[in-house]
């Protein structure tokens, strides 16, 4: 424990802002040339002769480095890539043979649309989101107790992807679902580890509450802002 003199020193320091750097203490606008802090703009599409704007930007970067585009992939390879990325599984023989045999000029667009409408799409992309927000179906720590109702939030995320929920609503529902009528969405806030191995004393329980609140703040920062706010608990962000 701190001595009375040490406690008084801390009180004095807080009272007169001893040691504070005025440049840090004063709030200021973010000054950085990092791309994530720049205003969103629509850049002009490079004129490279490609039909897809993404290919045009890729081609421009390759040209600047004296590189060339890879040959166009075969239909078989494209179908395989599409299913692996969107559903996490390779196409069945029936799917592949049916696509290759079709003479429909719109078969690629139809295949993509069918994949997006399949429930597996939501299951696949929900995994990416749940990993990002530190979702777990157990509490962690020594006891690692199962969370009997965690699946409700997991299924809510899957349904949100399959229903094509607008992103602004998706975010709002997870941060303030209890206010906007999407209570299941707030599972985001408590998806992290929960320490049940704490002593009965009030001090340790209060500390555990602060740890969980800090976890919520850090998860919000890393998920929606791309910034690690957790270090600001002990350090000044610059």
Q: Can you name each region flagged by the protein language model?
A:
Residues 1-178, 237:
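Aromatic- and Gly/Pro-enriched helix-to-coil junctions and flexible linker segments
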Residues 1-7, 181-238:
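Sequence context surrounding c-type heme c attachment/ligation sites in exported
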């Amino acid at each position: 424990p701190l001595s009375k003199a040490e406690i008084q020193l801390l009180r004095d320091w807080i009272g007169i802002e001893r040691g504070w750097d005025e440049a840090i203490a004063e709030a200021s606008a973010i000054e950085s040339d990092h791309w994530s802090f720049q205003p969103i703009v629509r850049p002009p599409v490079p004129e490279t002769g490609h039909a897809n704007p993404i290919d045009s930007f890729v081609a421009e970067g390759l040209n600047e480095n004296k590189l060339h585009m890879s040959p166009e992939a075969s239909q078989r390879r494209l179908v395989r890539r599409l299913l692996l990325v969107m559903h996490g599984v390779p196409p069945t023989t029936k799917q592949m043979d049916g696509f290759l045999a079709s003479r429909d000029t719109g078969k690629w667009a139809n295949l993509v649309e069918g994949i997006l409408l399949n429930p597996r799409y939501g299951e696949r992309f929900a995994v990416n989101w749940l990993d990002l927000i530190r979702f777990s179906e157990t509490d962690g720590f020594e006891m690692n107790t199962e969370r009997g109702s965690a699946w409700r939030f997991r299924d809510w995320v899957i349904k949100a992807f399959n229903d094509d929920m607008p992103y602004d609503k998706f975010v709002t529902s997870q941060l303030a679902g209890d206010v906007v009528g999407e209570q299941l969405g707030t599972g985001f806030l408590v998806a992290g580890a929960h320490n049940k191995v704490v002593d009965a004393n009030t001090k340790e329980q209060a500390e555990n509450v602060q740890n969980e609140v800090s976890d919520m703040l850090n998860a919000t920062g890393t998920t929606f802002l791309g910034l690690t706010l957790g270090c600001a608990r002990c350090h000044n962000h610059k």
